[in-house]
Amino acid sequence: MAMFVRTSSSTHDEERMLPIEGAPRRRPPVKFIFPPPPLSSLPGFGRPRGYAGPTVIDMSAPDDVFAEDTPSPPATPLDLQISPDQSSGESEYDEDEEDEDEEENDDVQEEDEPEGYPADFFQPLSHLRPRPLARRAHTPKPVAVVAGRVRSSTDTAESEASMGWVSQDDGFSPAGLSPSDDEGVAILEPMAAYTGTGAYGLSPASRNSVPGTQSSPYSDPDEGPSWRPLRAAPTAIVDLTSDSDSDDSSNSPDVNNEAAFTDARHFSHQPPSSEEDGEDQGEVLSQRIGLMDVGQKRKRQSTASSGSEDVVRCQRQPNLSRKAVASVIIISSGSDTDEEPSSAVSVIVSPSSTKGHLPTQSPSTSAHSISSGSTTTAGSRCSDPTRILASTPPLCGNGAYNWPWLD
């Protein structure tokens, strides 16, 4: 078995690198072909067949290589054998027992081991090697654990008293600091519409506690959706199925009339007339629109027109029958002026059909539950909702009206 420890180099490369005559040239590295004779006699370390060269080509080194080290060169396999001085100084066990052991092992040492080498010198050092890690194919591996638990309403008072923190709806705050009473959460009450589906409105008690109404130094009143409290507004009835384009006082009751205003709230309880019984109720549905509530809307930033902008929002309700369809339409009319607040009119389209068994609207959960019943005049902008529905396309985005939960 040959061991090469030299780096081959070409003479042509050296001539190109050192063209000056008389310059010191690097000596070619000396190679270590075979181990010393004691090791070469071991099986596997002998000379190959046909080799007649020297056994060892010595690598000469200058004298100052080991000057800073110990006087002797580094330890080699020859230095690991026990010297006679060390063996003579050892008297840990009896000499008679040592002689008996030597006599028994003389034959074995003569066959397997050369002179001066211990028997286990070339044995595999399996006991000195580090063991590989045990395979954990199906065992759980440790992971980082973060201490924490879900707090309930019963143990927050006891546990947070020692921590000095108070839990709120949106996180934790230091103890002693609690949100003011004005920053409450709006209570949403279900508004029982004619179809009985999920239309919600603000109760009169929760209008003053709508979040965002209080001025904050970190918020811009002109940015984001409006959450200002709703205000009372007039109510009127307009028949969209009518062919007349003029505002006929006979078709729509007077807005300033309290009796007509009360009838407009409960128009869904009116039984169908005798004339409607004669018509085909499966194809023609008599639709009546009640303008229920008007809310204040935030000032628009657009300066495209100095007049008012009318915005229409529609929400489709699930069909309770094939012939009865109801939807909620919010008509928002705003102004760019600061003096006159903008208004939003809610329109409910509720078909009346004798075949469709739809839930009726109770007076307690009618539109009056979110309206204070004021009878102020509506103004000329909302006088003709049919023109608003026909001329103004529906717009997208939040902030166009103050009921974002209808999206």
Swiss-Prot record:
Q: Which residues lie in Low complexity bias regions?
A: 342-353, 360-383
Q: Name one GO biological process term.
A: symbiont-mediated perturbation of host innate immune response
Q: Does the keyword Metal-binding apply?
A: no
Q: What is the effect of changing residue 223 to A?
A: Loss of p53/TP53 sequestration to the host cytoplasm
Cellular location(s) = Virion tegument; Host cytoplasm; Host nucleus; Host Golgi apparatus
> Where does this chain mainly localize?
virion
Keywords from the named record: Early protein, Host cytoplasm, Host Golgi apparatus, Host nucleus, Host-virus interaction, Inhibition of host innate immune response by virus, Inhibition of host IRF7 by virus, Inhibition of host RLR pathway by virus, Phosphoprotein, Viral immunoevasion, Virion, Virion tegument
What is the name attached to this protein's record?
Protein ORF45
Q: Name one GO cellular component term.
A: host cell nucleus
In the UniProt record, the gene name given for this protein reads ORF45
Q: Where is this motif: Nuclear export signal?
A: 284-294
Give the Polar residues compositional bias ranges: 1-10, 205-218
* Species the sequence originates in: Human herpesvirus 8 type P (isolate GK18)
Q: Partners and quaternary state? A: Interacts with host IRF7. Interacts with host RPS6KA1. Interacts with host RAB11FIP5; this interaction results in the lysosomal degradation of ORF45 and the inhibition of viral particle release. Interacts with host p53/TP53; this interaction down-regulates p53/TP53 signaling pathway. Interacts with the N-terminal part of host NLRP1; relieving autoinhibition of the NLRP1 inflammasome.
Spell out the post-translational modification annotation for this entry.
Phosphorylated on Ser-41 and Ser-162 by host IKBKE and TBK1.
* Superkingdom to which the source organism belongs: Viruses
Bias kind Basic residues: ranges: 128-139
**Residues annotated with Phosphoserine modification:** 41, 162
Report the outcome of residue 162 to A. Answer: Impairs the inhibition of host IRF7 transactivation activity
Span(s) of short sequence motif Nuclear localization signal: 297-300
Acidic residues bias (residue ranges): 91-115
Disordered as annotated region, ranges: 1-183, 196-318, 332-407
What does this chain do?
Prevents the establishment of cellular antiviral state by blocking virus-induced phosphorylation and activation of host interferon regulatory factor 7/IRF7, a transcription factor critical for the induction of interferons alpha and beta. Mechanistically, ORF45 competes with the associated IRF7 and inhibits its phosphorylation by IKBKE or TBK1 by acting as an alternative substrate.
